[in-house]
Amino acid sequence: MADLVQNAANNVLNDGMDTSRHTSSTAAPPSRNEVELNGQPPTAPPPQVVTDSEEDEDEELTLKYGAKHVIMLFIPVTLCMVVVVATIKSVSFYTQKDGQQLIYTPFREDTETVGQRALHSMLNAIIMISVIVVMTLVLVVLYKYRCYKVIQAWLFFSNLLLLFFFSLIYLGEVFKTYNVAMDYFTLALIIWNFGVVGMICIHWKGPLRLQQAYLIMISALMALVFIKYLPEWTAWLILAAISVYDLLAVLCPKGPLRILVETAQERNEAIFPALIYSSTMVWLFNMADSAETRNNSSHPVPQQENQVVAMAPTAQAEDDGGFTPAWVDHQQHQLGPMQSTEESRRQIQEMPSARPPPPADDDEERGVKLGLGDFIFYSMLVGKASATASGDWNTTLACFVAILIGLCLTLLLLAIFKKALPALPISITFGLVFYFATDNLVRPFMDQLAVHQFYI
C-alpha cells in the first residue's frame, strides 16, 4: 500500500528555510580568508529584517509548487487510467470471465442466492486485505532493520514478473485482437528489450521520462490483472476496504506506512523507486553517494571553525587585524591603490568568489511522490467501471473526474498539513459514489430520455 509523500529532505529543508527566513539575526564577521578575497576591511552586515514581501514570496512559492504538483500528478494518473480503459474497451481478454481467480480469493461468486454471494465476496475481501496488511508489515520490518538487499530482491523479482511475463500476455492479446501476425523470435526479442530496459531504468539508472513511463505501465498491467481475475463484488469491496486501511496505515501513530515514512525521514533516505512514482529522478545507487558526499562536505566546517578560533588571539595581539604593510603592498600591486571609489567597489564585486555554489538539489527535493498502489487502484476503479457499466461512457468519465477531484483535495490537504497523507480515501470514496450514482440513477434516466426522444 502506498501513500502520498513528499521527500523527507524536502520537509526538513523547508522547515529550516522557514525558520531562518522569519528570524532576525546578525551575521558573524567574516574570516581572514574572506577578507583577503574581498580586498576590503571587514564590515558587519546590517541585521536581517522580515518584510511583508518575503511572506508574499512564501505564499507565491507555495501556490506555484502546489499547482505544479497537481499537474505533475494529473498527467501520469490520467495516462495510467487511459491505458487501462483503452485496453478494456479494445481487448476482450480482460473482460471475459473464464472461471479463473486469484489464489487470494478462493470463494466463488456464482452462487444461488444473493446472500451467499455477498458473504463470499466479503470473505474474499477480508483475505485480500489481510494479505496486503501482512506484506506491508513484512516490508516495514525489513526496512526498519535495514534489510535493503532483501527488499531490492523482492521488488526486483516482482518487476521482473510484470515486465516479462505479464507484458508477454498483454502484447500477445493485443496482437490477437488486432490480427497482427508475429513470429516467436521477434516477440521474444521485443519482450527482452522491453523488460531489460525497464529493469535498468527502475532499479539502476535511466532517463526520468522513461522511468516514469515504465512505472505507469507496470501499474496499468497490475490493474488489468486485478480487473480480470477479481470477482465483481469482491473488487468493489476491496476498493472500499483498501481506502479505509490506507487511512489507518498512514494517519495512525503506529500505522505501518507512517512508520515507514518516519523511518525514511529519520534516516534521510528516499523510499525505493520501485514503490513510488516520483516527479523527479530517484536512483538507488545515488543514495549512498549523496549521503557520503554530505558527510564529507560536513567535516571541513568544524575544522575551519577551529582554525578561526585558534587564530583569533594572535590577531587581537597584533592589533592590526592582519592588515600588515606587506599585505597592503601586495593588494595595491594586484588591485591598484585602494581607494573607496565607485570603480574599485565595482571591480571588487565582480571578482569571482571562492565560496562553493549552493546545492542544486532543491528542485529535485521538491518533487512530489505518489505510491504505485494508488495508480493501481485508481486504474482498477475506472477499468472496472468501464467493464461492468454496460459499456456506458458516462459512468467511466464520472469515475475518472471523481478520482481527479479527490486527488486535488488530497494535494490541498497536503499543502495545509505538510505531512504524508493517504491518497486513496478521498479519491476512491468519490469514485465509488460517482459510479453507483451514475450507473443506477443517471444512466437509466438518460436511457429513458433517449427512448422517448425527450431532450433537455
UniProtKB/Swiss-Prot annotation:
**Residues annotated as transmembrane:** 71-91, 122-142, 156-178, 184-205, 210-230, 238-261, 370-390, 397-417, 422-442
List, in alphabetical order, the Gene Ontology terms for molecular function in this entry: aspartic endopeptidase activity, intramembrane cleaving
Region annotation Disordered: where it falls in the sequence = 9-56, 332-365
Any Pfam family hit: Presenilin
Supply the enzyme class, top level.
Answer: hydrolase
| UniProt keyword annotation of Cell membrane present | yes
Q: Does the keyword Aminoacyl-tRNA synthetase apply?
A: no
The known PTMs are summarized as: Cleaved, probably through autocleavage.
* Subcellular localization: Endoplasmic reticulum membrane; Golgi apparatus membrane; Cytoplasmic granule; Cell membrane
Annotated EC:
3.4.23.-
Q: Which InterPro entries match?
A: Peptidase_A22A (IPR001108), Preselin/SPP (IPR006639), Presenilin_C (IPR042524)
Question: Motif (PAL) spans which residues?
Answer: 422-424
Region ranges (Important for cleavage of target proteins): 277-279, 366-370, 421-423
Q: Where is this site: Cleavage?
A: 280-282, 287-288
Q: Name one GO cellular component term.
A: mitochondrion
Q: Which UniProt keywords apply?
A: Cell membrane, Cell projection, Endoplasmic reticulum, Golgi apparatus, Hydrolase, Membrane, Notch signaling pathway, Protease, Synapse, Transmembrane, Transmembrane helix
Topology class, membrane = Multi-pass membrane protein
Chain ranges sitting on the Cytoplasmic side read 1-70, 143-155, 206-209, 262-369, 418-421
Q: What does this protein do?
A: Catalytic subunit of the gamma-secretase complex, an endoprotease complex that catalyzes the intramembrane cleavage of integral membrane proteins such as Notch receptors and APP (amyloid-beta precursor protein). Requires the presence of the other members of the gamma-secretase complex for protease activity. Plays a role in Notch and Wnt signaling cascades and regulation of downstream processes via its role in processing key regulatory proteins.
Domain annotation text?
The PAL motif is required for normal active site conformation. Substrates, such as NOTCH1 and APP peptides, are bound between PSEN1 transmembrane domains and via the first lumenal loop and the cytoplasmic loop between the sixth and seventh transmembrane domains. Substrate binding causes a conformation change and formation of an intermolecular antiparallel beta-sheet between PSEN1 and its substrates.
Q: What is this protein called?
A: Presenilin-1
Q: Which organism is it from?
A: Danio rerio
The major lineage groups are: Eukaryota, Metazoa, Chordata, Craniata, Vertebrata
